[in-house]
Amino acid sequence: MAVFNKLFKRRHSVSEEIKKDDLQEEVEATETEETVEEVIEETPEKSELELANERADEFENKYLRAHAEMQNIQRRSSEERQQLQRYRSQDLAKAILPSLDNLERALAVEGLTDDVKKGLEMTRDSLIQALKEEGVEEVEVDSFDHNFHMAVQTLPADDEHPADSIAEVFQKGYKLHERLLRPAMVVVYN
């Protein structure tokens, strides 16, 4: 019986060890599964958070670009409106300039009565004043500038008349603000 007890105890202790090992393996397996599940759960959340942040950054960049583009469109539109407003009378001024030239030619005719001459001068002056109010100015003819003058004839320069000085103006030139409407036709010493 002593042998039986010994065997029983041994078998019992082996079986308890197996149970303990199984229990420990189960606990370890459960802990490992929980850890893996936690890691798996944390990883998608982190990825989702990162993705959400990236998308938010992307949307913010798109918004900022769209906002900047809208500001540029508004600025360009405003500049275009200002340019149109500034030069709105360009076509009208170009159409009126030949009439102004005709008034100048009529005033140059000899034999006009004082009343007719005064009437032509008043008409010319009121026309010039109306053009000035719109920003139309006569081109200066101090010295030749190819940007504002058209040389229709040249004369040889001498001591009295240096090169690039204007001898005579055939037709006055006009500009609207800084934009040339018509160059002055001049005779130039060369």
From Swiss-Prot:
UniProt biased composition (Acidic residues): 23-42
Cytoplasm found in the keyword field: yes
Organism: Streptococcus pyogenes serotype M1
Protein name: Protein GrpE
Location of the protein in the cell: Cytoplasm
Presence of the UniProt keyword Chaperone in the record: yes
PANTHER family: GRPE PROTEIN, GRPE PROTEIN HOMOLOG, MITOCHONDRIAL
HAMAP family listed in its UniProt record: GrpE
Region entry Disordered, spans: 21-49
Broad class of the protein's primary localization: cytoplasm
GO molecular function: adenyl-nucleotide exchange factor activity; protein homodimerization activity; protein-folding chaperone binding; unfolded protein binding
GO terms for cellular component: cytoplasm
PROSITE patterns documented for this protein: GRPE
Entry's family note: Belongs to the GrpE family.
Gene: grpE
CDD domains recorded: GrpE
One Pfam family linked to the record: GrpE
InterPro entries: GrpE, GrpE_coiled_coil, GrpE_head
Keywords recorded for this protein, A-Z: Chaperone, Cytoplasm, Stress response
Protein origin, superkingdom: Bacteria
Subunit structure: Homodimer.
Function: Participates actively in the response to hyperosmotic and heat shock by preventing the aggregation of stress-denatured proteins, in association with DnaK and GrpE. It is the nucleotide exchange factor for DnaK and may function as a thermosensor. Unfolded proteins bind initially to DnaJ; upon interaction with the DnaJ-bound protein, DnaK hydrolyzes its bound ATP, resulting in the formation of a stable complex. GrpE releases ADP from DnaK; ATP binding to DnaK triggers the release of the substrate protein, thus completing the reaction cycle.
GO annotation, biological process: protein folding
